[in-house]
Amino acid sequence: MEGTSESPVLDEFEVNNNDYDNDFISRFSQNPLNAFSLFTDGNLQEYFMNNSLEKIVIHVVLIVISLCGIKAQTSKIIYVVRLLFWKIYNVINNLVNKVINREKIINHQVVDNRFREFEERFRLLLLQHDKNIAKQDDIVQYNKLDNFAESIKSEFNLKVAEMERRFQELKWRCDMIANKAMNTIVLANTVDSNNKDEKIVFDEGSVVQYNRE
């Protein structure tokens, strides 16, 4: 494929068919030395500010080739130079894309590592919170069991005190019954002893009367 001044060679580097460029090419085609008049007649600073680096390099290449005595068509030279620029552009663009992609990968890895670190810290925080809740639950359960044991102990002490009271009352009643029984037995023995100690006195008159009968 051969580029012409009427059609652009590449999308990235279209031929800028302005008056200045056309004037330069027309003068260069007639006589390469005539191109220097553009630098002398015009402002050199304006030339460098109004033209892209690609165009300036192309102009310089054309002048160098013409001064070296190489007879070549302007369109072919421009096409080759544009291909060279396109290749350089692609290389630089690929390098830039690689650097950008590498930075994206690095940033993605950094973000992923930060996210994993945050996730791990959050998981540890939840575990610590669960442990604290479990400890609090254990303390609550222990307090409940302790209160339950204390209530059973208090109730048991009350039952024991009630049984002791009833035992003392039963003992007192048994002692009363035993004392009454002992008193009754002693009294009965005393009465029997008195009855045995009494003497029987017979009346003589009664005896005589008994004999008569």
Curated annotation (Swiss-Prot):
Q: Which keywords does this Swiss-Prot/TrEMBL entry list?
A: Activation of host autophagy by virus, Enterotoxin, Glycoprotein, Host endoplasmic reticulum, Host membrane, Host-virus interaction, Ion channel, Ion transport, Membrane, Secreted, Signal-anchor, Toxin, Transmembrane, Transmembrane helix, Transport, Viral ion channel, Virulence
So which residues have sugars stuck on them?
A: 50
What post-translational changes are documented for it?
A: The N-glycosyl content is primarily Man(9)GlcNAc, with a small amount of Man(8)GlcNAc.
Tell me where the transmembrane regions lie. Answer: 52-74
GO molecular-function terms, A-Z: channel activity; toxin activity
Query: Which residues are exposed on the Cytoplasmic face of the membrane?
Result: 75-213
Superkingdom in the source lineage: Viruses
Record topological domains on the Lumenal side: 1-51
The cellular component terms of Gene Ontology attached to this UniProt record, alphabetical and capped at eight, are:
extracellular region; host caveola; host cell rough endoplasmic reticulum membrane; membrane
Q: Which family does it belong to?
A: Belongs to the rotavirus NSP4 family.
Annotated protein name in UniProt? Non-structural glycoprotein 4
Its taxonomic placement starts with: Viruses, Riboviria, Orthornavirae, Duplornaviricota, Resentoviricetes
